[in-house]
């Protein structure tokens, strides 16, 4: 069994891969104040509930965009599994050529997604990850990571509107039927959600043009992350949603880097 750990700004996703399939996955809150002991208790409870034996874990790989949580998580791995985890970062074998000005600046999550997308599709691609931040990444047919862009996630946009506009309430991110709304809540929902979809469509259109100007074929657009399906249902610029893209990338990177 391989334990895959994807640390995001809001949630930590853990997956267990065994015999070419996923046998368990969990989502817990990211909390940099938790100690390694607290994470150890939580992870062991998850294993017990799933009736999994931690001694059968052969290896662990961690991808994180939250640096100050890594000490606790790495110690948790050592305590629970008596192994050193592979950590996605500078020096790791990826199989892709990162064309960033400073490759060390590329977030681990973006590298992991790019590896999975390229291994699976082997074509020019735009990868959109709808997380706390929304990231757009461009990959060539040869596997060059050209770069991309980062913008606030949908929830951040909603929170900012609530926090900075005194008379506007905090709202649930639900899709209204119309963009011509007759109350404050649905007006905010329409502006946030449909406005966000418009932003995605424009960025994808612009990225496609820039990639094709470089001689690439029209890129395939792959989306992942918690709100990917919401956006996918309202636009035709996304070709596919892959909710397990990051875990797939971690599994591929583990195989490339295990001793």
From Swiss-Prot:
Cofactor comment: A monovalent cation. Ammonium or potassium.
Record Gene3D superfamilies: 3.30.420.40
Keywords: ATP-binding, Coenzyme A biosynthesis, Cytoplasm, Kinase, Metal-binding, Nucleotide-binding, Potassium, Transferase
Binding positions for ATP per the UniProt entry: 6-13, 132
Pathway(s) annotated for this protein in UniProt: Cofactor biosynthesis; coenzyme A biosynthesis; CoA from (R)-pantothenate: step 1/5
Binding site residues for K(+): 129
Cofactor needs: NH4(+); K(+)
Reactions listed under catalytic activity: (R)-pantothenate + ATP = (R)-4'-phosphopantothenate + ADP + H(+)
Protein's name in the database: Type III pantothenate kinase
Pfam families named in the record: Pan_kinase
Annotated compartments: Cytoplasm
Catalytic residues (UniProt): 109
A single GO molecular function term of this UniProt record: metal ion binding
Gene responsible for this protein: coaX
Biological process, per Gene Ontology: coenzyme A biosynthetic process
Main subcellular location of this protein, as a coarse class: cytoplasm
Segments crossing the lipid bilayer: none
The EC number(s) this enzyme carries: 2.7.1.33
């Amino acid at each position: 069994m391989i334990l895959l750990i994807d640390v995001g700004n809001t949630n930590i996703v853990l997956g267990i891969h065994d015999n070419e399939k996923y046998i368990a996955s969990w989502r817990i809150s990211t909390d940099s104040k938790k100690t390694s002991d607290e994470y150890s208790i939580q992870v062991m409870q998850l294993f017990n509930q799933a009736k999994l034996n931690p001694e059968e874990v052969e290896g662990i790989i961690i991808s994180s965009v939250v640096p100050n949580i890594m000490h606790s998580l790495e110690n948790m791995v050592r305590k629970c599994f008596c192994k050193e985890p592979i950590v996605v970062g500078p020096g790791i074998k990826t199989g892709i050529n990162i064309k960033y000005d400073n490759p060390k600046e590329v977030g681990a999550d973006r590298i992991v997604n790019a590896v999975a997308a390229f291994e699976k599709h082997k074509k020019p691609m735009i990868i959109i990850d709808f997380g706390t931040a929304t990231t757009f990444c461009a990959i060539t047919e040869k596997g060059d990571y050209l770069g991309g862009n980062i913008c606030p996630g949908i929830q951040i946009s909603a929170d900012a509107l609530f926090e900075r506009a005194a008379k506007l309430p905090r709202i649930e991110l639900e899709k209204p039927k119309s963009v011509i709304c007759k109350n404050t809540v649905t007006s905010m929902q329409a502006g946030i959600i449909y406005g966000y979809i418009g932003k995605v469509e424009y960025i994808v259109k612009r990225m496609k043009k820039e990639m094709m100007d470089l001689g690439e074929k029209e890129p395939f657009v792959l989306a992942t992350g918690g709100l990917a399906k919401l956006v996918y249902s309202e636009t035709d610029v996304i070709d596919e949603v892959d909710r397990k893209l990051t875990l797939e990338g971690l599994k591929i990177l583990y195989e490339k880097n295990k001793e």
